[in-house]
Amino acid sequence: MRKRNPRRATPEELRVCSVLKEKGTREELAHLAARGEWSNVPAYNASREQIADHLGKSVSPESDASFFDSRRFSEAIVLLKSRPVLLVKNGIFDEAPLAGLEQRLKKHRAALATPIRSVGRLELIDHDSMDWCGTGWRIEDDLIVTNRHVASLFAERQGSLFRFRLNQAGKQVRTRVDFREEYRQPESDEHVIARVLWIAPDVSEAPDMAILQVVKGDLLPPPLVLARQDAEPRQAVAVVGYPARDSRNDAGAMEDIFGNIYDVKRFAPGEVVGLPHDAWYLTHDCSTLGGNSGSAVLSIDGGEVVGLHFGGQFRKTNYG
């Protein structure tokens, strides 16, 4: 009889398994399940008793992967609690839903307010179909960093320089960065993008990066500090940016994690997953969506930039 090969865990299951390795996370999730905190949604495809019983055991990653197979809502709850996407108000991110995670974050909350304020939403004026297109953040002088694929929506190369694109009516598309755009906060902090200085070539060996020049003024937030050392696996990080609704993703899981609130500044904590050999990027497990393109990946301990988020797959792997 031919021996069947064991099923390989999906990226979603591997992500959940990684999260459940964190100190105290498994026990706290089991406690929440035992208290019935998940029982009000019947579509979890697992009863609260089943979830609590499973999480209360010390099992292998393979057992976790098997348990969460096809249990989309069970998986979404693990990510909702342990990889939340926290709202930001006046530069301060909300309290995390898990006590252990909140304990790790709260001692850095005040210090992280400054770098959080230096991340903004890139907005478009006179674009044919879009009001905004991604995230950008300030570095030294009057420079804004974003992704190549974001900048290419409003700018293009012309010889050795770059110019703003024209819309269908022949009018130049203009761009600005708003460092606020927070949930239910009416204030704005808008600054005009004067020039596009550089867009990386669209080749695999080049980073997905672009450099913009903002009109310099005294009211600009302080520049972010770039980390001097490479990130390390399992280093605590957070993606700061503006996740947008993405119709390509599972609507139910997306609503569970993002709370049906999009287009505003969010703080998404997580960890560095890996640093591929000889690559210019890292992978992380923070919860992100399309509008996060161009987001800053910040070290939670020091607030320095360890990466530029440029892509990934919802509930799977992200790149920076």
PLM features per residue range, with description:
Residues 111-126, 130-133, 137-141, 145-290, ...:
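Serine endopeptidase catalytic core focused on the charge-relay Asp
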Residues 1-134, 264-269:
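Protease-domain processing segments flanking chymotrypsin-fold serine proteases, especially trypsin-like
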Residues 67-68, 73, 93, 101, ...:
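Phenylalanine-focused residue identity feature
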Residues 2-26, 30-35, 39, 274-280, ...:
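C-terminal subregion of chymotrypsin/trypsin-like serine protease catalytic domains
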Residues 101-105, 231, 295:
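Short, solvent-exposed coil/turn linker segments
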